[in-house]
């Protein structure tokens, strides 16, 4: 019997690679390039282990064809696996007389495999059909940790990587998780709960946030708030749950990391509780956030706080099994976390026709985009001569975002100072923080230069003076930015800049665009400048679409400017929420006072009370034909989550019809 392990994955370019594995030398050779691709440190020992190069699959991508303006599914390469085969039968038979050198070599290769397992992306997805079997497997097979230095080779034998010896599996010390269960993530909690009720029904306690619907019938339930109140008021908790032995399952909805102490206290109270099930309606990153509604750090420590609900390790256990815990989270967290997605209904889409101004902006950006596409010839020897559908969709999404931002940046001339005020202050805050950090770094290096006894020479090439000078130059540049923006912040600054002919094309009848530096340039010139220099043509102040405003008075009737998009959002009530994945559009709408949430903000799901007061949700996203799969799934999950919290809410998608 042989154990098969993937030792290394090799990606080979199409038409440039013909791989060959030389057994005697332990090398993978590219015949076409006459080059060694990979070399093993030790050659194989066939009685105990051997390597084999095996074809896995072709790599393909949808590549743009400039001559037909279409995409063609093109093979761009191949994937090969260098597979390690371990003869378990021979190892077991020879375990008392095997050469120690063989074990050392095998340990070396298995350590590399373990390290690579930490970096490999895991699959967390399961299907509705596999859900009952997965639940049975979770209940009947509790998670257990084994020492990091032990590598299981089969049912009977294990290799001790630290002491370089073979041991039987009966000799392995194991640390079991005290509870069974897992975390389920789904885009439709109602349907998931319906499926789980078939397997987990009796003797269950349900923990839900305040305002969350009761999806479980014939089960006791409690909200986080109720439990906290009972504890703070020293109320008799036993009166609410008199028969604590009747609870065998605890089911937690929307488990935020700050609620973990509450859950652990409940687990300790219900001594007969065997399983804990967490059901989240959004990805895990949305539940790890700080109390001040800012995004928390997605760290191993935070993830293990969740895992320790089932493990229930003491402080000493955490110290003793620190390495094993890290390995579990990095390599085996898919034993505790599962995603199950259901089909969702398409949202109604309100199509808004672009006005002349929006079309002109779009056409200017599209001109550069199409010019770039037309020059792509898919040269095999030039990686920059082709583009994939995914990359091209990202560009389309960026252009769409730019059009939306500039359309919402049409401002009355008298409001320019107010319009730029928040933008300037934000830039000042960021640069001041960076300047202070650089000052601290300079102090550290100056201090190190004074205390160091090493002389600068070829053997010790750390030149503290050079580093300090480089940091000082960076600090001077940042201070220059701070000085400029302090000047821009002065009242009346934008009025002092004369608005004569466009200083670039000298046109006297143009749509005026005020830049954050105060200069006025025609819109066409700005849009032509952005793809190249990204700076004001007069003072070279860095600019982007967030650092400009289009003067409403300069548009004129000849451009047939319609404020349909602007009016649509202007007439929205406080009971309307805008959800978007367009970061720049989010920034401009936030400035203008809309209830707008950016899709990636981790604190969104915490505002259940706010969502209960909302009557309408508008989804403003990239065009449907260019939105990436990750954002599409996140929108679906938020859509179902919002409907779950507020069943009467109206959700629609608004899209500017330019693609």
Curated annotation (Swiss-Prot):
PROSITE patterns in the record: ZF_RING_1, ZF_RING_2
Cited SMART domains: RING
Top-rank lineage group of the source organism: Viruses
Xref: Pfam families: zf-C3HC4_3
Keywords: Metal-binding, Zinc, Zinc-finger
InterPro entries in the cross-refs: Znf_RING, Znf_RING/FYVE/PHD, Znf_RING_CS
Name of the protein in question: Putative RING finger protein R311
The organism of origin for this protein: Acanthamoeba polyphaga mimivirus
Species lineage: Viruses, Varidnaviria, Bamfordvirae, Nucleocytoviricota, Megaviricetes
